[in-house]
């Protein structure tokens, strides 16, 4: 509908315009005539499809035929032609976007893979793969020297003037001038730097090729003329700057595109975009073509120059000299290159030889031989012009297929001729390109043999000929190989030959091993791969050589000392020997350079370790007997006399550390000052050291152990009398007796070595000699106390059991002879048990200390209700009786076999006065008075005491604690005095030492609860206590001196039970408070989790 309406509108407009023209040009505006003109206009429209020639003839008719026709002609000239409407194709006929993208991608890949090139230039994709071969896409340094005095850098280096001065840059080439790096000549003013900038964007469609020549000339001028250093910079220094440097290398260093880019890639990671690489490929093609043209022109000019030089030589020298031409051969690779002058002269000599008819054996001179200097110049000029014309036709000769066939045929004829006579070969046209030379070759090729006199003059063979010959040989070999492969059967024979060829390639070139294994990865068995590996590394040759040497059984000649590889120390040692006049011993040098295998080295190292451990154990035994200081007290022979040569003495520090670690130091470390001189015992013979193959000492460990056991056995028998005398000494005096007169030997006498401990054991109880409980601490500690490791019970057992037992073989207690067999697990168990025991004791003492502190506090005395006098008297009497009962009934410590069984040793419980008990008796408990705080310091925070960690407060053994501590009245008074005097000094203690807790007040000896009333009462008394604290302490001192021992003891016992019950109740209340608080925390957590879950559900 729309199109029809438009047509109607156009027709109406056209009719109006026709009427206007008619009224303007025609003289008869009558209505009838106008109607008639309308009819004729429609007729003319109907016949307007007539061809151009016919329409022209119609319109060229005279005007009198019809005025309407004339009007139509005028209208067609005045009005523009109607434009033809082109119907737009529907959307369904258009290509979809996906298809267009695929086609675009395909075209891009085609451009990247385009390898069309006359000079085998690689495609863009291959170049990009070569540049990104090692997966390093970004440079590691902001600036790198990619070519001598040529640096590629990023923007940060280009704008750093100080760094440019340090680098010594004299020229700057900015590849991003105005497009990222905004520098210029004004920026580098005053630095004596020449600047050049090009404005190129780093886009694939950017054209950087117009700047290749100018930038390369700038670089060449900077390097050659100014002898300077050039910085080529861009934004990142990977694309634009790298392309410009590559263009310089291609233009002025005659490199190909791959050589230039890889040369830069060696020093810096570069990544030019695709468009720049395409432009570099085009530059590479252009340069290759120019070089070929230059080579052709150079060859043509050289040929002309050589010809003129030859004619001048003929003018000055007789033409006979042409037969004796001096040929300069330069060996380069495998072919010889002959100079063009000699080749031209050889061509003239050949032409002369052909004309003279050299087939005759007498070699007569021809008539038309080149004339002497008297010859006319016209012939010579004509020859030169003819040679020039022939040289200029060589390109047509290259393009001729007949010429290539002639070359191949000539090669075949060369192969068929006799090897003694050298055949004619096509010479290189770069050196000899004249028509005469070709004619000579053709004529000589038709003859059966050449003349011997001309063999030297035609012996030139160029590099191209050698290349052709090599290529033909390769083609023949390939053809022969294909022929053999076709004839051969596809059976095991073919596979075996293939393997043989591969093995041959492996033997010739080890680098082909990877390709061979890659091709035959699935076909080879592990044994075959192992054999090939042996071939690759040359093990088979070594074995064959060794077998050959063994079969010949001839003494090998001594190698040259210069070929011997020595270490730096060995070389220095030889130089020192020569310097001081020593002679060079060849056998010693070879022995030093001969590397020993790992097994021998391990055996030698093991022997050295065994020897060292043996020496240390012997030194321990020696230190037990004390040969250094008390050799006069005993007449036995020292151990060092047995093995003076084999076992050198070790240091005292080594003895001490070794014996402490091994845990086998003898319990006989204490030496008695009252020992009697025993009878001389028969000394066991020491083990004889066995010499190894290299002169080293071979040690038999079993013999050494037995020998040590026998020596120790005899020594212990000698010392038994001394120990019997030491057993009668009181336990409290044993340490001083055994360590009397020993100030220097404390380290030797305090070490643990159970090597000789088993000698004093009875057969029924062979595991109890040394105490480990509380006394082991004095031996292991570094306090330097010279306490004895023997208890009274242990000494008596030793004296009783030594008469019955005798060591015959090496005993096997917990720790064996050497250090590496120590059972560390048992040592850790023993240490943990000792620590736990000490922890329990300290916890009980802490509770006791707190009770003692609280019963003397002022606050407790004020809160304590007054009792009746009768009750006080009863309590005093009861307390006195209990105190006397406790002092009289001091139970002896029980023997604890739990810890002693770990070391198979007796417990040290027989000594009633242990060092721990003595130390704990004098422990001064710190004051439990709370820290005085100011009013504005906030609420008082008390820390939880350490005894809150106890899970079972009712399980505390307070009765055993009271029974184990024996405190007399005097000691109690002294203790209370010391404690009261410490109260004053404890006022300024650190608040961290006070017991602070948010939920529980300090323990004050009462039956406390966690109620608010107790806290309020505590705070009320605190202010009063602050004001009169010092007075209370002074009064307490005087009251302690006035009270009798009975009153103090009875009152303490009575109050102690109440305090313990209050303490237990307090612990239970705190535990319940903690549990309640944890429950509240759990409820808060659960509520929070439910809220979070509801929020997450709402979000979902």
UniProtKB/Swiss-Prot annotation:
Residues 418-428, 580-615, 888-898, 1089-1100 have a biased composition (Basic and acidic residues). It comes from Danio rerio. Disruption phenotype: At 2 dpf, morphants are morphologically normal but show pericardial edema and tail curvature. They exhibit near complete paralysis at embryonic and larval stages, producing extremely low levels of spontaneous coiling movements and a greatly diminished touch response. They show a severe disorganization of the contractile apparatus in muscle fibers. Sarcomeric structures in mutants are almost entirely absent and only rare triads are observed. Expressed in muscle fibers in a regular striated pattern (at protein level). Residues 1-21, 356-383, 411-436, 479-504, 542-561, 575-615, 667-686, 888-1060, 1075-1100 are annotated as: Disordered. It comes from the Eukaryota. One of its GO terms (biological process) is negative regulation of MAPK cascade. This is Serine/threonine/tyrosine-interacting-like protein 2.
């Amino acid at each position: 509908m729309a199109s029809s309406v438009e047509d109607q509108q156009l027709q109406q407009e056209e009719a109006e315009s026709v009427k206007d023209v008619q009224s303007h040009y025609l003289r008869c505006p009558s209505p009838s005539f106008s109607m008639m003109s309308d009819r004729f206009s429609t007729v003319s429209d109907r016949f307007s499809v007539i061809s151009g020639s016919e329409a022209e003839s119609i319109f060229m008719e005279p005007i009198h035929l019809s005025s309407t026709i004339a009007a139509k002609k005028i209208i067609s000239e005045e009005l523009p032609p109607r434009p033809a409407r082109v119907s737009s194709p529907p959307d369904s006929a258009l290509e979809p976007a996906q298809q267009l993208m695929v086609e675009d991608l395909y075209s891009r890949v085609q451009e990247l893979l385009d390898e069309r090139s006359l000079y085998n230039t690689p495609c863009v994709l291959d170049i990009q793969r070569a540049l990104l071969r090692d997966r390093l896409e970004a440079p590691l340094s902001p600036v790198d020297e990619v070519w001598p005095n040529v640096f590629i850098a990023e923007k940060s280096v280009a704008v750093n003037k100080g760094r440019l001065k340090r680098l010594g840059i004299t020229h700057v080439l900015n590849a991003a001038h105005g497009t990222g790096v905004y520098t210029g000549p004004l920026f580098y003013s005053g630095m004596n730097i020449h600047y050049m900038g090009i404005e190129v964007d780093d886009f694939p469609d950017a054209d950087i090729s117009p700047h290749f020549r100018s930038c390369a000339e700038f670089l060449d001028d900077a390097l050659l003329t100014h002898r300077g250093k050039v910085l080529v910079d861009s934004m990142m220094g990977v694309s634009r700057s790298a392309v410009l440097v590559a263009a310089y290398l291609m233009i002025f260093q005659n490199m190909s595109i791959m050589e230039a880019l890889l040369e830069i890639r060696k020093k810096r990671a570069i990544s030019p975009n695709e468009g720049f690489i395409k432009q570099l490929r085009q530059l590479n093609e252009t340069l290759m073509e120019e070089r070929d043209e230059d080579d052709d022109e150079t060859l043509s000019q050289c040929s002309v120059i050589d010809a003129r030089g030859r004619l001048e030589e003929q003018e000055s020298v007789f033409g006979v000299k042409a037969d004796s031409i001096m040929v300069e051969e330069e060996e380069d690779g495998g072919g010889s290159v002959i100079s063009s002058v000699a080749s031209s002269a050889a061509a003239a000599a050949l032409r002369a030889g052909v004309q003279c008819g050299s087939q005759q054996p007498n070699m007569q001179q021809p008539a038309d031989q080149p004339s002497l200097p008297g010859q006319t110049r016209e012939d010579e000029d004509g020859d030169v012009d003819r040679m020039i014309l022939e040289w200029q036709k060589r390109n047509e000769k290259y393009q001729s297929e007949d010429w290539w066939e002639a070359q191949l045929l000539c090669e075949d004829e060369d192969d068929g001729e006799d090897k003694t006579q050298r055949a004619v070969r096509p010479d290189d046209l770069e050196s000899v390109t004249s028509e005469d030379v070709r004619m000579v070759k053709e004529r000589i090729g038709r003859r059966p043999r050449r003349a011997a006199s001309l063999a030297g003059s035609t012996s030139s063979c160029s590099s191209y000929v050698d290349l052709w010959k090599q290529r033909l040989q390769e083609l023949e070999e390939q053809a022969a190989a294909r022929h053999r492969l076709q004839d051969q059967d596809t059976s095991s024979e073919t596979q075996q030959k293939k393997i043989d060829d591969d093995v041959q390639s492996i033997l010739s070139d080890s680098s082909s091993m990877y390709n061979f294994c890659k091709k035959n990865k699935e076909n080879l068995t592990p044994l075959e791969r192992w054999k090939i590996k042996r071939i690759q590394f040359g093990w088979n040759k070594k074995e064959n050589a060794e077998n050959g040497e063994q079969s010949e059984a001839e003494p090998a000649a001594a190698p040259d000392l210069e070929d011997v590889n020595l270490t730096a120390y060995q070389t220095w040692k030889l130089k020192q020997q020569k310097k001081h006049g020593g002679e060079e011993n060849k056998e010693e040098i070879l022995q030093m350079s001969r590397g020993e295998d790992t097994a021998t080295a391990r055996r030698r190292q093991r022997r050295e370790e065994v020897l060292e451990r043996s020496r240390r154990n012997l030194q321990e035994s020696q230190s037990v007997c004390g040969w250094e200081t008390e050799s006069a007290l005993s007449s036995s022979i020292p151990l060092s006399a047995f093995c003076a040569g084999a076992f050198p003495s070790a240091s005292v520090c080594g003895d001490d550390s070794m014996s402490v670690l091994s845990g086998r130091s003898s319990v006989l470390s204490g030496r008695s000052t009252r020992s009697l001189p025993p009878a001389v015992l028969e000394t066991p013979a020491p083990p004889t050291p066995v010499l190894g193959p290299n002169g080293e000492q071979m040690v038999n460990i079993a013999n050494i152990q037995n020998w040590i056991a026998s020596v120790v056995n005899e020594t212990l028998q000698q010392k038994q009398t001394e120990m019997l005398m030491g057993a009668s000494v009181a336990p409290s005096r044993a340490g001083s007796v055994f360590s009397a007169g020993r100030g220097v030997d404390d380290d030797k006498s305090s070490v643990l070595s159970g090597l000789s401990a088993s000698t004093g054991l009875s057969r029924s109880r062979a595991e109890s000699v040394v105490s480990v409980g509380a006394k082991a601490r004095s031996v292991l500690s570094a306090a330097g106390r010279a306490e004895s490791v023997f208890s009274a019970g242990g000494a008596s057992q030793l004296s009783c059991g030594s008469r019955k037992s005798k060591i015959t073989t090496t005993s096997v207690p917990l720790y064996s002879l050497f250090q590496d067999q120590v059972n560390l697990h048992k040592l850790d168990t023993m240490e943990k048990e000792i620590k736990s025991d000490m922890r329990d004791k300290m916890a009980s003492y802490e509770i006791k200390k707190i009770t003692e502190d609280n019963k003397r506090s002022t606050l407790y005395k004020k809160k304590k209700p007054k009792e009746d006098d009768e009750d006080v008297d009863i309590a005093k009497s009861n307390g006195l009786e209990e105190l006397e009962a406790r002092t009289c009934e001091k139970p002896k410590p029980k023997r604890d076999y739990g810890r002693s069984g770990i070391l198979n040793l007796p417990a040290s419980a027989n000594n009633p006065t242990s060092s721990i008990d003595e130390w704990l008796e004098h422990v001064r408990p710190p004051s439990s008075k709370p820290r005085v705080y100011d009013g504005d310091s906030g609420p008082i925070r008390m820390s939880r005491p350490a005894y809150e960690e106890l899970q079972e407060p009712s399980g505390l053994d307070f009765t055993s604690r009271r029974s184990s501590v024996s405190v007399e009245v005097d000691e109690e008074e002294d203790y209370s005095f010391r404690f009261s005097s410490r109260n004053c000094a404890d006022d300024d203690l650190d608040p961290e030492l006070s017991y602070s807790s948010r939920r529980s007040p300090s323990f004050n000896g009462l039956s406390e609860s966690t109620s608010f009333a107790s806290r309020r009462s505590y705070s009320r008394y605190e202010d009063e206590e602050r004001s009169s604290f010092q007075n209370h302490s002074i009064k307490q001192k005087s009251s302690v001196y006035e009270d009798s021992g009975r009153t103090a003891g009875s009152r303490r016992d009575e109050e102690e039970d109440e305090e313990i019950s209050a303490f237990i109740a307090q612990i239970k209340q705190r535990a319940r408070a903690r549990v309640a608080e944890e429950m509240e925390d759990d409820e808060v957590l659960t509520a929070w989790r439910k809220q979070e879950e509801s929020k997450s559900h709402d979000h979902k």
